[in-house]
């Protein structure tokens, strides 16, 4: 098998979104799974729209999710001389020509064609022009598209695709200012980089016949194509920012783990048996672009949160502390190692994101200044206050290094007072945490420690 060489080639006109990241991951997996090469190319030929910040954000996103590319990043803006050489080659071989048609003439032609209910297109009037060029017109360069031919290719996702060249006009490969067009620079770079397989969004499918015309004109080897359907929202519509089409780095800020995001995106458009959870190593062992789905996939926050919760639960306390560094939460330095481990173990089971985990740390470690009203109103204060006073005395003698001892202290009150567990546990939870839900009470007592637990009960009794 020949060496697999893939690439990801974004335009730095905006931040990298999840559709682009998914395409990059597919290309990365295919190359790495076959011990091939994966390149990053920045398509920055549109100098008026380029953003250095956007280019840097693409690189930052790659670093975050762990996509390592081979060699140096290729910037198209530094390769204009190379493109000009190949444009000149086509001109010299009479495979391309200068077109002196002005914009006004082209607009008028299109209006006439529309009036005749024809498809607006250039009419090839300068294809075989041998006369004197009109003055004051900076020409564009157009490729001579072969006529009456069928361009066919077997797309790895879409299947057999055929287009008659008569449906194509002689499209522009260099603008009047000499800058090359997108379709031209793409095929030159793919050929010179030795790209064997192109995995990209199916919005590029219509470009492929034109690119094949150029591959053939320059005698370049045509790569294999895989055109992946776009990601839709849960209503089957194009993704909006509200539905997930946002900067990839926003997901890091929202508290998603890179492993979860990669797993989620790969499953949006690719499947392997009935498996849902994939480590990067498993993806490298299983991924084959032949298994890419031909139908659009739907973005689901519920699915992403489920996957992220799975990966969160499997993180060690030490790793979680590292991952939590970008987020703001209460100081943990007063906790001993056992308390810290217990805190993170308890809360990671109840959190879907790192951001949510950070908030839950605050919910436990910041003493309540007010109490959940609907729970507080249901309390029988005449019954509860003496019980909490008695339990406070029990806690002063309890061994806080042993969770079972703390649990026994709670059950002692319940048994001695002959009350239902909920009648005591609910107000105790309210006193310790300020609300009716949260982590287990023996966990809360162990994490807070004797002094803080007693203090919180005393504050509750004062209210």
Curated annotation (Swiss-Prot):
Its EC number is 6.1.1.17. ATP binds at residue 241. Keywords: Aminoacyl-tRNA synthetase, ATP-binding, Cytoplasm, Ligase, Nucleotide-binding, Protein biosynthesis. InterPro entries: aa-tRNA-synth_I_cd-bd, aa-tRNA-synth_I_codon-bd_sub2, aa-tRNA-synth_I_CS, aa_tRNA-synth_I_cd-bd_sf, Glu-tRNA-ligase_bac/mito, Glu/Gln-tRNA-synth, Glu/Gln-tRNA-synth_Ib_cat-dom, GluQ/Sye. HAMAP family: Glu_tRNA_synth_type1. Monomer. It is found in: Cytoplasm. This is Glutamate--tRNA ligase 1. A motif ('HIGH' region) lies at residues 10-20. GO terms for cellular component: cytosol. Belongs to the class-I aminoacyl-tRNA synthetase family. Glutamate--tRNA ligase type 1 subfamily. It catalyses: tRNA(Glu) + L-glutamate + ATP = L-glutamyl-tRNA(Glu) + AMP + diphosphate. GO terms for molecular function: ATP binding; glutamate-tRNA ligase activity; tRNA binding; zinc ion binding. Pfam families: Anticodon_2, tRNA-synt_1c. The gene is gltX1. Its main location: cytoplasm. One of its GO terms (biological process) is glutamyl-tRNA aminoacylation. It comes from the Bacteria. A motif ('KMSKS' region) lies at residues 238-242.
């Amino acid at each position: 098998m020949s060496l697999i060489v893939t690439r990801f080639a974004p335009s730095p006109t905006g931040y990298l979104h999840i559709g682009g990241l998914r395409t990059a991951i597919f290309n990365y997996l295919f190359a790495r799974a076959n011990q091939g090469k994966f390149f990053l190319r920045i398509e920055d030929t549109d100098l008026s729209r380029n953003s250095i910040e956007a280019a840097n954000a693409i690189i930052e996103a790659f670093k975050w999710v762990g996509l390592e590319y081979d060699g140096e990043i290729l910037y198209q803006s530094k390769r204009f001389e190379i493109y000009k050489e190949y444009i000149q080659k086509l001109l010299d071989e009479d495979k391309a020509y200068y077109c002196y048609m002005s914009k006004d003439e082209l607009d008028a032609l299109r209006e006439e064609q529309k009036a005749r209910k024809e498809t607006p297109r250039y009419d090839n009037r300068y294809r075989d022009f041998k006369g004197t060029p009109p003055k004051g017109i900076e020409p564009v360069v157009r490729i001579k598209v072969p006529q009456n031919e069928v361009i066919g290719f077997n797309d790895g996702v879409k299947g057999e695709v055929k287009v008659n060249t008569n449906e194509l006009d002689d499209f522009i490969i260099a603008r009047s200012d000499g800058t090359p067009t997108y379709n031209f620079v793409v095929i030159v770079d793919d050929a010179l980089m030795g790209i064997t397989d192109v995995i990209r969004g199916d919005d590029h499918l219509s470009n492929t016949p034109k690119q094949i015309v150029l591959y053939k004109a320059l005698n370049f080897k045509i790569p294999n194509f895989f055109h992946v359907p776009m990601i839709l929202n849960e209503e089957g519509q194009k993704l909006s920012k509200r539905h997930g089409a946002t900067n990839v780095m926003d997901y890091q800020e929202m508290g998603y783990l890179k492993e979860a995001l990669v797993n989620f995106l790969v499953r949006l458009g690719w499947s392997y048996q009935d498996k849902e959870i994939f480590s990067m190593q498993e993806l490298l062992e299983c991924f084959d672009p032949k298994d890419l789905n031909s139908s659009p996939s739907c973005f689901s926050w519920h699915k992403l949160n489920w996957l992220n919760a799975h990966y969160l639960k499997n993180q060690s306390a030490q790793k979680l502390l590292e991952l939590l560094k970008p987020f703001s939460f209460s100081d943990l330095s007063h906790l001993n190692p056992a308390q810290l481990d217990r805190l993170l173990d308890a809360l990671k089971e109840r959190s879907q994101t790192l951001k949510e985990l950070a908030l839950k740390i605050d919910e436990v470690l910041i003493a309540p200044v007010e109490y959940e009203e609907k729970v507080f109103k249901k309390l029988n204060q005449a019954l509860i206050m003496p019980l909490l006073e008695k339990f406070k005395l029990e806690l002063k003698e309890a061994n806080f290094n042993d969770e079972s001892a703390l649990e026994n202290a709670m059950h002692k009150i319940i048994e001695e007072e002959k009350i239902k567990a909920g009648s005591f546990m609910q107000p105790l939870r309210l006193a310790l945490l300020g609300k009716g839900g949260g982590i287990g009470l023996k966990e809360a007592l162990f994490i807070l420690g004797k002094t803080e637990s007693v203090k919180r009960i005393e504050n509750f009794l004062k209210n």
